[in-house]
Amino acid sequence: MADITAALVKELRERTGAGMMECKKALVEAQGDIELAIDNMRKSGQAKAAKKAGRVAAEGVILTKIAQDGKYGVIIELNCETDFVAKDGGFKAFGDEVITAALNERITDVEALKAKFEEQRTALVAKISENINIRRLGVLEGGVLGSYLHGARIGVMVSAAGADEELVKHVAMHIAASKPEYVNADDVPADVVAREHQIQLDIAMQSGKPREIAEKMVEGRMRKFTGEISLTGQHFVMDPSKTVGQLLGEHGAKINNFIRFEVGEGIEKAEVDFAAEVAAMGKQF
């Protein structure tokens, strides 16, 4: 039997919204394979949908900067340990220096960016007594570039064609709010589509309908699925009567690419109380 850790149970609970006992049981049955556990829970109706792995648990800021000619832009995530330090003047100044260098020197590799600022980072850590990390760097080049920051925790950069700055800004704001994973439905990887198709087919077959009818039911569900995770298929947050794709079509524009960063995505802090709770629960198995 695979080792079912407290962290694994917690992640499954967060991604499915199911109860602790259901998550523990699903992981045991799936021998610790969290993705298989999610699929099985969805098929059985215990989980309607699964959130992406990882949760926001760190502090820090997202910064964006676009060159004066508007053709090159960078976005970075700079982490610290507490919200207090995230608002510190020295921390902010360090972030400004980092992103300015990334832009002006066209640095595209985060490890190279880290190496360039390691001495300054170490000095700042010693001064404020908190760990600091240049975690991520994203670059977009070409087209009409635009960015949007929602506070300091969510940042978006967009590259578009045939769009003005206002349209790009509105699309960036939509991305910040709606978290699309791909630009178009056709961009969704085949393995992601195949996995969801199998889940939906299994659910449809449970109704007792013939396979050909179940397949037709799944076709509609799959269109909805790919539409919900792709930018152009989502309903525009500022005018839900149309999709982002329809909005772009009205302006003769298209989105080339986008980057969305949120502080702490995928970083998890240990929570001892929850571990103790799961350990006690584990005695029932």
From Swiss-Prot:
An example molecular function term from Gene Ontology annotations: translation elongation factor activity
Positions of the UniProt region annotated as Involved in Mg(2+) ion dislocation from EF-Tu: 82-85
Keywords assigned by UniProt, alphabetized: Cytoplasm, Elongation factor, Protein biosynthesis
Record has Protein biosynthesis as a keyword: yes
Short name of any one Pfam family annotated for the protein: EF_TS
GO cellular component terms attached to this protein's record: cytoplasm
Physiological role: Associates with the EF-Tu.GDP complex and induces the exchange of GDP to GTP. It remains bound to the aminoacyl-tRNA.EF-Tu.GTP complex up to the GTP hydrolysis stage on the ribosome.
HAMAP family to which the protein is assigned, alphabetical: EF_Ts
Record's protein name: Elongation factor Ts
Species the sequence originates in: Sodalis glossinidius (strain morsitans)
